[in-house]
């Protein structure tokens, strides 16, 4: 008798995606990140839903409603900190997932890669709007500074900012619309994830060697389901350790002070996962130039497939490319550190040098290293 999972239309769909999916036999733990990102997304939607039941998106009550969730709601503090730190885990997995794609040449699957970049932008937008909702000092001033960047758009900039704000400053209208978009975007992200998987399953997964996976495949279940469960346990262990032992480690103390338009915090900075882009923004003295550099720091990922000059897909056997890759990774960490530092010497200079290096590595060093390797291997 044929199993139900192979005959029922709905079960058949799940079966082809999670059970009988042909997967390369040699994919490493770096391929676990997709399932971890799915777990993070589900966790964020569930915890966010419970938070939305108790949160009040009103400028006069938002801060108090978050305090009420933390103090009075049954396990409200767990839900709140799971949601806040879950976002951090989401971005850690996201950055590692992109890093894996860059290292092993997964960007050559163009549709999957481009939808992935759209997913990154949508996730960043969602996280930014979520950071505004507690209506603390850093929420308010972060929203003011980042939305104000739209004023750099020539001619229509000022009107654009006031349109986003819903007034002449960040106020109740801004908070309400940010809550609305923060609520709806995760569901749009879920739809994009389905598209991402649809295109991935058209080509099949890449593998560490960067060679065809067709000759040697195994079923996703039980081999990779077991492997994914191990990754899941490690993720939950890290997340619960953060939530239960040090829930405010990645947050900002200023956000425990209610938003006050008349008092500016000494150092306005976004959440840690935006610091690299914030550092690039601050490194350019011109406002419009800074905004363009900020956008390009993410959108440059779309040019990676065009800059691929190597004859091999993966970096596994390309030592020069590996060197440039790890230089870029170290540079990214330096930018993250710089983004959290005050705007003073020597941080300004370090920020400018690392920002220039960020673009030079991607646009010049990696393609050049690949061409040299082609010559060395006599593959030209």
From Swiss-Prot:
Its cofactor is heme b. It is a multi-pass membrane protein. Signal peptide: none annotated. Its main location: mitochondrion. One of its GO terms (molecular function) is ubiquinol-cytochrome-c reductase activity. Keywords: Electron transport, Heme, Iron, Membrane, Metal-binding, Mitochondrion, Mitochondrion inner membrane, Respiratory chain, Transmembrane, Transmembrane helix, Transport, Ubiquinone. The chain crosses the membrane at residues 33-53, 77-98, 113-133, 178-198, 226-246, 288-308, 320-340, 347-367. It is found in: Mitochondrion inner membrane. GO terms for cellular component: mitochondrial inner membrane; respiratory chain complex III. Heme b b562 binds at residues 83, 182. Heme b b566 binds at residues 97, 196. Belongs to the cytochrome b family. The cytochrome bc1 complex contains 11 subunits: 3 respiratory subunits (MT-CYB, CYC1 and UQCRFS1), 2 core proteins (UQCRC1 and UQCRC2) and 6 low-molecular weight proteins (UQCRH/QCR6, UQCRB/QCR7, UQCRQ/QCR8, UQCR10/QCR9, UQCR11/QCR10 and a cleavage product of UQCRFS1). This cytochrome bc1 complex then forms a dimer. Component of the ubiquinol-cytochrome c reductase complex (complex III or cytochrome b-c1 complex) that is part of the mitochondrial respiratory chain. The b-c1 complex mediates electron transfer from ubiquinol to cytochrome c. Contributes to the generation of a proton gradient across the mitochondrial membrane that is then used for ATP synthesis. Heme 1 (or BL or b562) is low-potential and absorbs at about 562 nm, and heme 2 (or BH or b566) is high-potential and absorbs at about 566 nm. This is Cytochrome b. The lineage of its organism: Eukaryota, Metazoa, Chordata, Craniata, Vertebrata.
């Amino acid at each position: 008798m044929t199993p139900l999972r192979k005959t029922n239309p709905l079960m058949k769909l799940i079966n082809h995606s999670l059970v009988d999916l042909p997967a390369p036999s040699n994919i490493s733990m770096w391929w676990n990140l997709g399932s971890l990102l799915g777990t993070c997304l589900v966790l964020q939607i569930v915890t966010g839903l419970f938070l939305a039941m108790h949160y009040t998106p009103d400028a006069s009550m938002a801060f108090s409603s978050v305090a009420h969730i933390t103090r009075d709601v049954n396990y409200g503090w767990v839900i709140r900190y799971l949601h806040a730190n879950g976002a951090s885990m989401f971005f850690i997995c996201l950055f590692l997932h992109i890093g894996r794609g860059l290292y092993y040449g997964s960007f050559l699957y163009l549709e999957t890669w481009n939808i992935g970049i759209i997913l990154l932008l949508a996730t960043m937008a969602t996280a930014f709007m979520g950071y505004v909702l507690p209506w603390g000092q850093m929420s308010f001033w972060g929203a003011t500074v980042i939305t104000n960047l739209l004023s750099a758009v020539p001619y229509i900039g000022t009107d654009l900012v006031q349109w986003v704000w819903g007034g002449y400053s960040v106020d109740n209208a801004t908070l309400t619309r940010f809550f609305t978009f923060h609520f709806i975007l995760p569901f749009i992200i879920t739809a994009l994830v389905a598209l991402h998987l649809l295109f991935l399953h058209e080509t099949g997964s890449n593998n560490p060697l960067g060679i065809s996976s067709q000759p040697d495949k195994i079923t996703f279940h039980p081999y990779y389901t077991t492997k994914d469960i191990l990754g899941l346990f490690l993720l939950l262990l890290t997340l619960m350790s953060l939530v239960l032992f040090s829930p405010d480690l990645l947050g900002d103390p200023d956000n425990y002070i209610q938003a006050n338009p008349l008092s500016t915090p000494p150092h306005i900075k976004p959440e840690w996962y935006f610091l690299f882009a914030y550092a690039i923004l601050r490194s350019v003295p011109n406002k419009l130039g800074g905004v363009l550099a900020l956008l390009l720091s993410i959108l440059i990922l779309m040019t990676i497939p065009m800059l691929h000059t190597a004859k091999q897909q993966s970096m596994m056997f390309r030592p020069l490319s590996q060197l440039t890759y790890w230089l870029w990774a170290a540079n990214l960490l330096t930018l993250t550190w710089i983004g959290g530092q005050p705007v003073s010497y020597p941080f300004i200079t370090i920020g400018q040098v690392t920002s220039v290096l960020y673009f030079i590595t991607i646009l010049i060093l990696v393609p050049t290293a690949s061409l040299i390797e082609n010559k060395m291997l006599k593959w030209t």
